């Protein structure tokens, strides 16, 4: 398969032998070699060459969809993996392409590559299989599917050493992208049209993947794994309810939920006096961060209050144009639901006149959505949250990752190093030099999703839009913390951007 590469040169000649790969890798990976020596065993070195004959031909029938496909499964995507249970990828191709047929407007060379991950809670994740609804429906659309696995916060090796702490998961996803680009001439699909998809922590990692393309911060980690010497930027991002911007998530959460003192999650409860005080302290820290982003109202916003390019700011009390923008987005969401026939008459905090949603009481809406987490929501003072666990080290399970929680810690907790914290936040890279950002973004966050503050995806989407990226952002009405609930719309978006 031939490809025309524009403005890019191939970094590596296709078809090199495994021996050559080993030589190149050993010359550039002294740190990883030392680490392997310490583990007292030499891991197998894997070829980065795609084996196009190592597949099974399968057929799946679900509902109206019958898909005949080739399954290339458990492909190790780095030459020197730390954990072959997770650093693997499943690759699925519609058999019709091998029969010389096209599907819709796609051929074996032009089909976009759907790149879904199954990561949740920053846990390790196996690659998605054909049983995953998004995978088999993507195949039915004519996409090629490359589903990567990745290490996570609880991954350990045989000696009990932590191997999946930050930034392991994003490094693994980048390595999988590099494998696809490395083998683009022999693998079906177009590696210049990779569309990543994920939910929750998986959505955060798709956003991070899209925002950090080719940034040098990740290079030492990729080199140590023996990742292909290729670019790792991607074409597009589909991110559902991303649990991202973790080092600012606590202050954003309390800006939204401060004053809501009851919470509902695994147990129902009421905030203590100390927690209420912490909530107030965190809330007051948010305006300074928000204002530092210098966000502006994106184009195509139709509001009597907010005009295009109006600065989105907050005063010391947490009020201002950014809050009005959040309100506008919620109002638009409610209007879409109302237009589709949803009965909103029981919601007394919504004002409806002449079939138009004219006002939403934001404070009453937040009470309706309810608080889920106690403050701090992410960097827990006892250092026991999933996110504390994410920012551990090889030998330390949990660490703080904000100065506030470190200074107010109820345990003898250490503070994570600055670089891993930076590397897990896409907001740090959107305007960074030497970084290739995905051009197309689709971000969804349900209106009653309480796992993180609504401010988090709004800031991400707005920062991207302000930098002239193509952003499709929406807040689906009455949707909680979930993803892939609108696959038909997602695939329509993919088809539209892939046609250009």
What residue spans do the PLM features occupy?
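A domain-start/cap signature at the N-terminus of enzymes
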Residues: 32-103
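Alpha/beta-hydrolase active-site loop
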Residues: 163-186
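Primarily recognizes the serine-hydrolase "nucleophile elbow" in alpha/beta-hydrolase
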Residues: 182-260, 421
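Sec-dependent signal peptide cleavage junction
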Residues: 23-33
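Cap/lid segment of the alpha/beta-hydrolase catalytic domain
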Residues: 116-171, 210-212, 479
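Non-catalytic, alpha-helical, charged scaffold/linker segments
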Residues: 240-244, 248-370
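Short beta-strand element of the alpha/beta-hydrolase
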Residues: 89, 103-120
């Amino acid at each position: 398969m031939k490809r025309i590469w524009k403005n890019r040169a191939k970094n590596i000649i296709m078809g090199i032998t495994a021996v050559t790969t080993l030589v190149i890798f050993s010359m550039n990976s002294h740190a990883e070699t030392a680490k392997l020596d310490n583990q007292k065993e030499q891991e197998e070195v894997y070829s980065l060459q795609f084996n196009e004959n190592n597949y099974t031909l399968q057929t799946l029938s679900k509902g109206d969809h019958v898909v005949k496909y080739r399954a290339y499964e458990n492909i190790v995507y780095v030459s020197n993996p730390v954990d072959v249970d997770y650093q693997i990828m499943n690759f699925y191709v519609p058999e019709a392409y091998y029969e010389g047929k096209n599907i819709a407007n796609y051929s074996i060379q032009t089909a976009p590559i759907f790149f879904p991950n199954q990561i949740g809670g920053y846990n390790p994740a196996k690659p998605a299989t054909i049983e995953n609804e998004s995978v088999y429906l993507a195949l039915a659309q004519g996409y090629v599917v490359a589903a990567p696995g990745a290490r996570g916060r609880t991954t350990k090796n045989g000696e009990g050493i932590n191997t999946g702490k930050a930034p392991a998961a994003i490094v693994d996803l980048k390595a999988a992208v590099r494998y696809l680009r490395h083998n683009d001439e022999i693998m079906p699909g177009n590696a210049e049209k990779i569309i990543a998809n994920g939910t929750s922590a998986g959505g955060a990692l798709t956003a991070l993947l899209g925002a950090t393309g080719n940034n040098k911060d990740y290079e030492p980690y990729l080199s140590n794994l023996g990742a292909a010497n290729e670019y790792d930027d991607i074409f597009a991002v589909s991110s559902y309810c991303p649990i991202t911007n973790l080092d600012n998530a606590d202050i954003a959460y309390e800006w939204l939920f401060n004053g809501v003192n009851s919470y509902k999650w695994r147990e129902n409860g009421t905030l203590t006096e100390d927690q209420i005080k912490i909530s107030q302290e965190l809330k007051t820290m948010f305006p300074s961060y928000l204002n530092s982003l210098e966000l502006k109202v994106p184009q195509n916003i139709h509001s009597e209050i907010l005009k295009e390019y109006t600065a989105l700011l907050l005063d010391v009390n947490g009020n201002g144009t950014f809050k009005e923008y959040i309100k506008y987005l919620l109002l638009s969401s409610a209007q879409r639901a109302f237009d589709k026939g949803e009965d909103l008459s029981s919601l007394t905090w919504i004002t409806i006149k002449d079939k138009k949603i004219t006002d939403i009481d934001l404070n009453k809406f937040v009470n309706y959505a309810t608080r889920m987490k106690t403050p701090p929501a992410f960097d827990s003072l006892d250092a026991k949250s999933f996110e504390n666990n994410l920012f551990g080290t090889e030998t330390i399970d949990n660490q703080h990752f904000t100065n506030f929680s470190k200074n107010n810690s109820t345990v003898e907790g250490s503070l994570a190093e600055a670089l891993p914290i930076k590397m897990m936040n896409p907001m740090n890279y959107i305007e960074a030099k030497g970084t290739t950002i995905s051009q197309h973004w689709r971000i969804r966050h349900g209106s009653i999703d309480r796992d993180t503050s609504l401010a988090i995806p709004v800031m991400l989407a707005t920062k991207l839009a302000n930098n002239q990226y193509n952003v499709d952002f929406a807040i689906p009405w009455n949707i909680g913390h979930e993803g892939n609930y609108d696959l038909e719309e997602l695939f329509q978006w993919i088809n539209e951007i892939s046609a250009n």
